[in-house]
């Protein structure tokens, strides 16, 4: 696949194909600036070379749109098909100032979080670099707007596909011009992966300036294991210690994600316990009101409970914000569209 390769890699590849280096630069322009979907579109390349590449099975690496869902607030969810017939979701979330793309890193997810639609179907496979990059290009194409921010908060556990994720970040940064500080990688926590991520990011990117978001979703180990079955293998304090190590190695503060589930983890005492855990930590807590999924027992908390939880954290000196809910009328929570289409 050509998508995902850097300008230098495309130049070297073109030379190896018997072409001049500038042919690689032309390819780069058509892949990333123009968003070409096939070699036949790249008419600046010699026709004979294009035909030869097709015969050799060389492809651009774009995915096919299977379904599109647009909410009243213009949040746009795409269901994309890979070349082996799997489907993944990506979401474009627009505001006046920015366009955030929520990308998937795997087909399905092995973490089985009880409140997540994606985890219901398990893991099929990890995505390749070009499949991650394509999601951003697809949203740009459909919404006719340049993405400004990227969040790895779609289907899958990014840290179980670290190299492809980091390679995609390099591409998004260098080839699409999206700054690392505008990219967030979210993880529910997998033992040993946080220290590895810090080292791998430095090796792959030369620096680690993207934001790491760790999904806590509970203020203690017992409740976390109830919500996230895999958490039993990763004690709460060990997870926080690995976050401190990541901060020390990269110099980047950690963001903690906390999904508020009505009547389960949204009480003032939960907020106080969470503040005790992360207080004094160079971090930020991002609260997320639960987005209901079909056939699930969890409830979205009331506005009063959400605001009360946030006030407790603020009074304890914890940096906190509440993520705006988007696309509620179109079931924009991760995995819902794919799950619905598979069941139909």
UniProtKB/Swiss-Prot annotation:
Domain spans labelled Radical SAM core: 95-329
An example Gene Ontology CC term for this record: cytoplasm
One Gene Ontology biological process: tRNA methylation
Keyword Magnesium listed: no
EC number assigned by the record: 2.1.1.192
Binding site for S-adenosyl-L-methionine: 156-157, 186, 215-217, 291
Catalysed transformations (reactions): adenosine(2503) in 23S rRNA + 2 reduced [2Fe-2S]-[ferredoxin] + 2 S-adenosyl-L-methionine = 2-methyladenosine(2503) in 23S rRNA + 5'-deoxyadenosine + L-methionine + 2 oxidized [2Fe-2S]-[ferredoxin] + S-adenosyl-L-homocysteine; adenosine(37) in tRNA + 2 reduced [2Fe-2S]-[ferredoxin] + 2 S-adenosyl-L-methionine = 2-methyladenosine(37) in tRNA + 5'-deoxyadenosine + L-methionine + 2 oxidized [2Fe-2S]-[ferredoxin] + S-adenosyl-L-homocysteine
Residues that hold [4Fe-4S] cluster according to the record: 109, 113, 116
Disulfide bonds: 102-334
GO molecular function: 4 iron, 4 sulfur cluster binding; metal ion binding; rRNA (adenine(2503)-C2-)-methyltransferase activity; rRNA binding; tRNA (adenine(37)-C2)-methyltransferase activity; tRNA binding
Names of required cofactors: [4Fe-4S] cluster
One family name in Pfam for this protein: Radical_SAM
Binding note for cofactor: Binds 1 [4Fe-4S] cluster. The cluster is coordinated with 3 cysteines and an exchangeable S-adenosyl-L-methionine.
Cellular compartment(s): Cytoplasm
PROSITE patterns, alphabetized: RADICAL_SAM
Active site: 89 (proton acceptor), 334 (s-methylcysteine intermediate)
Keyword Zinc set for record: no
UniProtKB keywords: 4Fe-4S, Cytoplasm, Disulfide bond, Iron, Iron-sulfur, Metal-binding, Methyltransferase, rRNA processing, S-adenosyl-L-methionine, Transferase, tRNA processing
UniProt record similarity statement: Belongs to the radical SAM superfamily. RlmN family.
Protein's UniProt name: Probable dual-specificity RNA methyltransferase RlmN
Gene name per UniProt: rlmN
């Amino acid at each position: 696949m050509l998508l995902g390769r850097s300008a230098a890699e495309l130049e070297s590849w073109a030379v190896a194909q018997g072409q001049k280096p500038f042919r690689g630069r032309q390819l780069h322009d058509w892949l990333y600036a123009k968003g070409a979907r096939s070699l036949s579109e790249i008419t600046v390349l010699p026709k004979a070379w294009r035909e030869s590449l097709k015969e050799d099975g060389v492809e651009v690496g774009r995915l096919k749109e299977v379904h599109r869902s647009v909410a009243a607030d213009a949040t746009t969810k795409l269901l994309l098909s890979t070349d082996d017939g799997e489907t993944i979701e990506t979401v474009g979330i627009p505001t006046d100032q920015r366009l955030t793309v929520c990308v998937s890193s795997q087909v399905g997810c092995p973490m089985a979080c009880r409140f997540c639609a994606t985890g219901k179907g398990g893991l099929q496979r990890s995505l390749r670099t070009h499949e991650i990059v394509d999601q951003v290009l697809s949203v740009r194409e459909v919404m006719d707007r340049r993405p400004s921010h990227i969040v790895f908060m779609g289907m899958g556990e990014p840290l179980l596909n670290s190299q492809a994720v980091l390679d995609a970040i390099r591409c998004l940064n260098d080839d699409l011009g999206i700054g690392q500080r505008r990219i967030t990688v979210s993880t529910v926590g997998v033992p040993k992966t946080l220290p590895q991520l810090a080292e791998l990011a430095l090796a792959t990117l030369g620096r680690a300036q993207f934001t790491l978001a760790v999904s806590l979703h509970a203020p203690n180990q017992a409740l976390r294991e109830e919500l996230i079955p895999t958490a039993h293998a990763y004690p709460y304090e060990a997870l926080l210690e690995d976050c401190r190590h990541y901060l020390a190695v990269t110099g980047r503060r950690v963001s903690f994600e906390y999904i508020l589930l009505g009547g389960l983890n949204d009480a003032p005492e939960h907020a106080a316990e969470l503040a005790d855990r992360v207080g004094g930590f160079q971090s930020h807590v991002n609260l997320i009101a639960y987005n209901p999924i079909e056939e699930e027992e969890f409830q979205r908390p009331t506005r009063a409970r959400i605001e009360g939880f946030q006030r407790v954290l603020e009074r304890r000196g914890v940096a906190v914000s509440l993520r705006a809910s988007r696309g509620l009328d179109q079931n924009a929570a991760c995995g819902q569209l794919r799950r619905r289409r598979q069941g139909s």
